[in-house]
Amino acid sequence: MIFRKLRKFLKSKLARYPAAFRIYEAISWTFTRSAFSPKHFFPTMAAILFPTWIAPRARLALHYVGEGKLDRAIAIAEDVLARKPEAYLDDDTFNRLAVAYHLEGRTEDLRQLYDNTEDRRSEIARELQYDRLALRFFPRAGFSSIGPLGLLDIYLKAQILGITPPRTNVILGARKEFANPAYLRYWEKYFSLVSHPPTIALLAPLSCYLEERSNQLWCGPRGMRNVAMIGRAAQLQWEAEGRGPLLELSNEHRERGYRLLREFGVPQDAWFVGLHVREASDRLNLRNADVGTYRLAVEEIAKRGGWVLRMGDDSMRPLPPWPNMIDYVHSGKREDWMDVFLWAEGRFFIGTGSGPQMIPPTFGKPVAIANYGPIATIVCGKDDILLPKPYWSKNEGRYLSLSERMQPNYAFNESIRAFAKFDVRVVDNTPDELRELVIEMINRLEGQHAETEEERATQAQFAALAATYQFYPVKIARVFMSKYPQSSQRHMASTFQESLLQHN
């Protein structure tokens, strides 16, 4: 952090001296991005001289992932696992190897990595009798981002419903280390927070064997289960029993939120929605979209008297003036509690396959989910609507059906690079499709949406598909069903069904 600030300071001062600035840039490139940079050079030498030294080799694999050299990253991951397949991998090492497999679309290898690691952790926990303590830890390393924080909803619902064993749930880390400290406070009603660094360090020998991951849940004798699978079971049962949301916006945040809306110019009686569009990230880039394509959707909301507040962070590109649109992330007034207010108090939320999409349902608010890729990973509820990205098969000259998207090559894949290997092009939703999604959400909320017989039949087919592959049967947007008919009932290879059922 100190060196980063120093570099930023020097860069600003040297900008007025072109010759000195070019020398600085050359030195900076050499020591930060070239093959001689410490982050690259030392792990590379360690990989050559000490091939059994796992930690630096895993760091090198992650470095290759960042450069888009996934083949090299995968080669390191496979060699590490081949040399020590029985070894317990710490979280950092595990995550570095897992990212490489995930981006390459190696779903089965990723699942095997999860299974082997969790089996080993469970074995050690039993040997040391840690499992008898009935504790469950949620470390900052795995749950600091906003999406994993939203998944606490699923973890808790599953425990309340008896799907997972009863545990005392402990979050490890200082509030300021999490993406949204104000949102974290809402969960402290149900979770204990340990924030004192020495205490966290003392707990480390215990907690490392009892930690949860943000995409796998421990279900007792049944072993590990994918969070989307547990999310389906928990949410369907929760809804069937008529239970309400776990979180409720505080009066203080509600009052402060509406006060700030007035400062933004939102009329007192106007309704509003939050909008978040993921952008500018190379990893998991299938989740990205162009916020500029949402203009027609925003105009539709404005036409109906609503306002839109664009959420995210100030690294996102600013928006031009749109009717009834507030570029909240560039307003200079962004606060963690205001983010919570927008998620919890908006009429609905417009999201993509990114973390903020997870939060409104924890307060009982619906989400219009657009530009979504791997449907098998969806975690949502009965009031949400999904507009997936279409998958175009170059070999067959047509769009893949929803059932075909459950095949191993596509089901959990979030890397456009990996799709290119299968000659499949992932297509972003069009401005017209995004507008139709918003219209459908508003009409549903106002009780003015009437499904056709064909839509009901298609939705029933999709629900059956979701039951087979154990993910939530979210409502598919009308515009997707009409524009990309899902009438063909192609089935998956029996080998994939068997492997999926064994995993379950």
Where are these regions (language model features)?
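A donor-sugar binding/catalytic signature common to diverse glycosyltransferases
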Residues: 339-385
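Secretory-pathway glycan-assembly enzymes, especially type II membrane glycosyltransferases
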Residues: 103, 110, 119-252, 462-504
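Catalytic donor nucleotide-activated moiety binding site of glycosyltransferases and closely related
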Residues: 270-271, 275-281, 291-336, 454-460
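Leloir-type glycosyltransferase catalytic cores
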Residues: 216-263, 382-504
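Structural register within alpha-helical repeat arrays
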Residues: 26-27, 60, 97
